[in-house]
Regions:
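N-terminal intrinsically disordered, cationic/polar leader segments
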Residues: 1-123
């Protein structure tokens, strides 16, 4: 069976960046991805989350279509809430080297337990 165009795009997903048009000032970029999914590494059941990214860019900004495809690439991947949130933080940091970054994984309740993971450059 031939892969559909969306599945092909997701399988080739790679984060990309663009030049920041306003490097002379600090400003916040808020991105929300409300349909994030990955697989629980213990059970294999899907985990659903809202991923929130807030950053102050330096020289680069993230290209949004590449971010969407990158985030969708986790849907069949077994990874914990903590690991995926930290991986997103690390990958975005490596790509953009922002002045400030916070990544939040706000996961839907499972077994009546809700998890929110927050990783930030601020201590």
């Amino acid at each position: 069976m031939t892969k559909k165009y969306g599945a092909k795009a997701v399988s080739k997903a790679k984060l990309q960046r663009w030049p920041n048009p306003n490097t002379d000032r600090d400003y916040n970029i808020d991105i929300e991805f409300p349909e994030f999914t990955c697989l629980c590494p213990r059970s294999g059941y899907p985990d659903f989350a809202v991923i929130k990214i807030n950053y102050v860019p330096d020289r680069y900004i993230v290209e949004l279509k590449s971010l969407k495809l990158y985030l969708n690439s986790f849907r069949d991947r077994s990874i914990s809430h903590e690991s995926v949130t930290n991986l997103l933080f690390d990958d975005i940091t490596k790509l953009l080297k922002p002045r400030r970054l916070e990544v939040t994984g706000d996961f839907n309740p499972r077994g009546n337990v809700k998890t929110v993971i927050r990783v930030s450059t601020e201590e």
